Amino acid sequence: MRVITGKARGVQLKTPNGMLTRPTADRVKEALFSVIQFDIPGSRVLDLFGGTGQLGIEALSRGAKSAVFVDAREDACKLIRENLKRTRLQEDARVIRSDYLDYLSRCREQYDIIFLDPPYAEVFLENSLNRITEIDILHSGGIIVAERPLGKELPWDYPGYTRSRDYPYGKILLTFYRKDGGSQETI
């Protein structure tokens, strides 16, 4: 697992032992970032299920202004900090150990891009999408990127959000939602 391009291009990221964290495959990550490449420079990013930190780190490497990484597990937070140090991107990042719903309930920040790549077997994805679309933490024109397995359905309609088409990559689907207002470019 590596940083694909930008300031930290080619840096190998540490990966976890065991299966509690499932990093996004490089080819999926490359496809994801090619879709949102023009939204990244200067953006504020939330990597809600941080895991290894690779999505937020890739965004920082490509010019995001800042990234917040949230994960409930201390070992994941430690791994994210190590990967930020390896890439020398830690100054523009914060790592927060918290349950995702607890974080969302007290979050007062606004973001331009939110990455959602939770454990597949749980209801975290639906719960986080529901909560994010209820509260005001995404700027107008901001993007939510949701990674999910084939066969796991997500709602098409959230008030104030437009869902673009799904992008399939093997057994994975990337789904993009854009908050209404601001830039209305199609994803």
Could you tell me what each predicted segment is?
Residues 1-187:
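Class I S-adenosyl-L-methionine-dependent methyltransferase catalytic core
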